[in-house]
Curated annotation (Swiss-Prot):
This is Homocysteine-responsive endoplasmic reticulum-resident ubiquitin-like domain member 1 protein. Residues 346-357 have a biased composition (Basic and acidic residues). GO terms for molecular function: transmembrane transporter binding. InterPro entries: HERPUD1/2, Ubiquitin-like_dom, Ubiquitin-like_domsf. The chain crosses the membrane at residues 264-284, 290-310. PANTHER family: HOMOCYSTEINE-RESPONSIVE ENDOPLASMIC RETICULUM-RESIDENT UBIQUITIN-LIKE DOMAIN MEMBER 1 PROTEIN (PTHR12943:SF7), HOMOCYSTEINE-RESPONSIVE ENDOPLASMIC RETICULUM-RESIDENT UNIQUITIN-LIKE DOMAIN HERPUD PROTEIN FAMILY MEMBER (PTHR12943). Keywords: Acetylation, Endoplasmic reticulum, Membrane, Phosphoprotein, Transmembrane, Transmembrane helix, Unfolded protein response. It is a multi-pass membrane protein. The keyword Metal-binding does not apply. The lineage of its organism: Eukaryota, Metazoa, Chordata, Craniata, Vertebrata. One of its GO terms (biological process) is endoplasmic reticulum calcium ion homeostasis.
């Protein structure tokens, strides 16, 4: 019985989370309860915290008042580190506490660490308790910026004042990150050309030829007849590239001569496609249908390549083929009095070409529509041949 009542001394090192005070080392008994230890700390701790306001943490666990130190502290260690979290009595004493902390910074920061090397693992817990201490009822009377500033000033000399627990710094960092992300997104979209508006009107770039200098007063205005019905002259640039076509993405595309200069691979592909078509038609149809389709296909192919035209193509007059037509408004010698237009004298005299054109503009007939459907169907089965080149 005497061995059970014999006191078991133990050394306790009580640390404050915000480093307002030095680490307090005291001697106790393993038979003490946590409530007895809190009552002892209320007498020896500098701020004299009440037992109900104290929170003791050991190895990351919150100690309850009814627990015994014998069950919590291992016997292999002689010094045990406890973290004390308590409320502040009055905010008016904060300047005095800050002055004491400033005096303690003059001493080397590593003195306590060299004395107790096993306490290095508790530094992270010390920082985590800062935020918990800010939420206590003692800080409710202080505004948020002042509370954050006082908490940062209360950190030890080994810690920076710009900790990641400040809500002001967190909001500022979030704004900077959002701005940088937005600028990177704008730069990426501008580099990819997503914001480039499409051209309103697709125009073909025309190579402008140097125009000769105009002669001053070459045709006086009094010698020119007043022709109000003259059509505007269309200026055709002979130096422009005639092989340009419009591009769906914007800008011109130069026609290439791939359709004319075909290699053996293109001809082999066309022959293989046509042979597959013939085999399907031959094996899944009769001989008469096969001959009919073959004949129509040959006729359509000859018409498509230009060997078997149904009507002559109109000859296109290019600007380089002959001199430009005479302009009525530019007749300085009044040669218009030599004769009048035969069409104006005889309204019954109509050229035969005009009658043909008027007949074509009336509308397609049923036969022409049926022929167009037949031609389009069989032309889609054949590969596209080289275009006819006008002489």
């Amino acid at each position: 019985m005497e061995s059970e009542t014999e006191p078991e001394p133990v050394t306790l090192l009580v640390k404050s989370p915000n480093q307002r005070h030095r680490d307090l080392e005291l001697s106790g008994d393993r038979g003490w309860s946590v409530g007895h230890l809190k009552a002892h700390l209320s007498r020896v701790y500098p701020e004299r915290p009440r037992p109900e306001d104290q929170r003791l943490i050991y190895s990351g666990k919150l100690l309850l008042d009814h627990q015994c130190l014998r069950d919590l502290l291992p016997k292999q260690e002689k010094r045990h580190v406890l973290h004390l979290v308590c409320n502040v009595k009055s905010p008016s004493k904060m300047p005095e506490i800050n002055a004491k902390v400033a005096e303690s910074t003059e001493e080397p920061a590593g003195s306590n660490r060299g004395q107790y090397p096993e306490d290095s693992s508790s530094d992270g817990l010390r920082q985590r308790e800062v935020l918990r201490n800010l939420s206590s009822p003692g800080w409710e009377n202080i505004s948020r910026p002042e509370a954050a500033q006082q908490a940062f000033q209360g950190l030890g000399p080994g810690f920076s004042g710009y900790t990641p627990y400040g809500w002001l710094q967190l909001s500022w960092f979030q704004q900077i990150y959002a701005r940088q992300y937005y600028m990177q997104y704008l730069a990426a979209t501008a580099a990819s050309g997503a914001f480039v508006p499409p051209p309103s009107a697709q125009e073909i770039p025309v190579v402008s030829a140097p125009a000769p200098a105009p002669i001053h007063n070459q045709f006086p205005a009094e010698n020119q007849p007043a022709n109000q019905n003259a059509a505007p002259q269309v200026v055709v640039n002979p130096g422009a590239n005639q092989n340009l076509r419009m591009n769906a993405q914007g800008g011109p595309i130069v026609e290439e001569d791939d359709e004319i200069n075909r290699d053996w691979l293109d001809w082999t592909y066309s022959a293989a496609t046509f042979s597959v078509f013939l085999s399907i038609l031959y094996f899944y149809s009769s001989l008469s249908r096969f001959l009919m389709v073959m004949g129509a296909t040959v006729v359509m192919y000859l018409h498509h390549v230009g060997w078997f035209p149904f009507r002559p193509r109109p000859v296109q007059n290019f600007p380089n083929d002959g001199p430009p037509p005479d302009i009525v408004n530019q007749d300085p010698n009044n040669n218009l009095q030599e004769g009048t237009d035969p069409e104006t004298e005889d309204p019954n005299h109509v050229p035969p070409d005009r009658g043909v054109l008027d007949g074509e503009q009336t509308g397609p007939s049923f036969m022409s529509t049926a022929w167009l459907v037949f031609k389009t169907f069989f032309a889609s089965l054949l590969p596209e041949g080289p275009p006819a080149i006008a002489n």
